[in-house]
Amino acid sequence: MVTKPARMYTRITGPAYTRKEFMGGVPYPKITTFVQGNQKRDFPIEMQLIAMESCQVRHTALEAARVSVNRRMTEAAGLDNFYLKVVPYPHHVLREHKMATGAGADRISSGMRAAFGRPVGTAARVYQNDVIMIGRTDEAHAHELKIALKKAAIKLPTPCKVVITKGKEIAGAIGV
């Protein structure tokens, strides 16, 4: 079965559906690593990727954004010169009522009778002004981190902004 477009699950409607003990066969989230880079070093510059609208972010979108930032920063700065943390966890279970299509589908399917749906994936509920990612680095790689976070924002279903939360005077002096 083909994956449905993410725009079907973007809006937040109704309460969160998270009680996995009552469901059978919830697929695991694709994102498994939430903290990357050098966790021990104290970096002078910190930037945050902040959601500007409320939405649900699928686990595949979170993973794509994480991979994007990680790849760009490891190529530019190496593993020891940055820190990355993905903040939201995809708790909300997404359901889909599979519909039969093609010739003779009306004889096989029961239409919208018992249309509750089966679990097909997970999503994180992100509200307006929530932090999605936190990135830290030094002065030499601050510009790369800002570009990496902007590229990650493209992969998410909400408009985002990059905010410098630590080291504004350093970042301003180097032109970030």
UniProtKB/Swiss-Prot annotation:
Which keywords appear in this protein's UniProt record, sorted alphabetically? Answer: Ribonucleoprotein, Ribosomal protein
GO MF terms, alphabetically ordered: structural constituent of ribosome
What is one Gene Ontology biological process annotated in the Swiss-Prot or TrEMBL record? translation
Q: Which Pfam families match?
A: Ribosomal_L16 (PF00252)
Q: Does the keyword Ribosomal protein apply?
A: yes
GO CC annotation: ribonucleoprotein complex; ribosome
Transmembrane residues, as ranges?
A: none
Matching entries from SUPFAM superfamilies are given as: Ribosomal protein L16p/L10e
Q: Into which family does the record put it?
A: Belongs to the universal ribosomal protein uL16 family.
| Protein's recorded name | Large ribosomal subunit protein uL16
